[in-house]
């Protein structure tokens, strides 16, 4: 099972991407539940394709890209290194984002968080319902493919909502530490919800793993 509490740039990226200087291949993480465990909110077909095909493709392409990057480093080929950056960002981001996403979900999820996380949500958004509305709106409003996020601003000590296009990783592009991510690529919902993204957003709140989100939040406060 994936680590459930990841905080800080080096701690966030190192376990997932590794260090290019000491190359180690990435692997597809196991899900902490069965493909059908999130039904009826997210069906088994979506989960199987999403995990075993889409996430697996990001992992495989990341490994290939890192091998090419290592070769470019060894040759001192700066042009090739620069040319590989988009693929590193896209596939590395896809691996990071999905590795968080799977642990953010649970068949025993839904409801509201408790304790310090709930108090922080009320402090920063007014109420839990207002927070849900804002994150839902940010996620629905993503043009094309991307992610809606609840992140932690370490400098300010506050929670923030953000949206990232494509597979841009939250921390690597905004500096916010990811706590909860909602995948709004069509492959995450189209087979069940067709083009009605708001229905998918309404359903996913029933399987949010608030224990995992809370663990991430508490780790980032240390």
Swiss-Prot record:
Induction: Expression is regulated by KRIT1. It is an enzyme of class 1 (oxidoreductase). The keyword Acetylation applies. One of its GO terms (cellular component) is mitochondrial matrix. It is found in: Mitochondrion matrix. It catalyses: 2 superoxide + 2 H(+) = H2O2 + O2. It holds the Pfam family Sod_Fe_N. This is Superoxide dismutase [Mn], mitochondrial.
């Amino acid at each position: 099972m994936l680590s459930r509490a990841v905080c800080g740039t080096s701690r966030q990226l190192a376990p997932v991407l590794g260090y290019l200087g000491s190359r180690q291949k990435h692997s597809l993480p196991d899900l902490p539940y069965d493909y059908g465990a999130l039904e009826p909110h997210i069906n088994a077909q979506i989960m199987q394709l999403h995990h075993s095909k889409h996430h697996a493709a990001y992992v495989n392409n990341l490994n290939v890209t890192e091998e090419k990057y290592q070769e470019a480093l060894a040759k001192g080929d700066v042009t090739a290194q620069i040319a590989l950056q988009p693929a590193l960002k896209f596939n590395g981001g896809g691996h990071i984002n999905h590795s968080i996403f799977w642990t953010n979900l649970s068949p025993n999820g839904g409801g509201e968080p408790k304790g310090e996380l709930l108090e922080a949500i009320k402090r920063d958004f007014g109420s839990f319902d207002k927070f849900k509305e804002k994150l839902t709106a940010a996620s629905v409003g993503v043009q094309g493919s991307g992610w809606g996020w609840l992140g932690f601003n370490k400098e300010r000590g506050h929670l923030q909502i953000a949206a990232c296009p494509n597979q841009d990783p939250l921390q690597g592009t905004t500096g916010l530490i990811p706590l909860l991510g909602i995948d709004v690529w069509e492959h995450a919902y189209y087979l069940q919800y067709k083009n009605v993204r708001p229905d998918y957003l309404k359903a996913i709140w029933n399987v949010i793993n608030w224990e995992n989100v809370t663990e991430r939040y508490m780790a980032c406060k240390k």
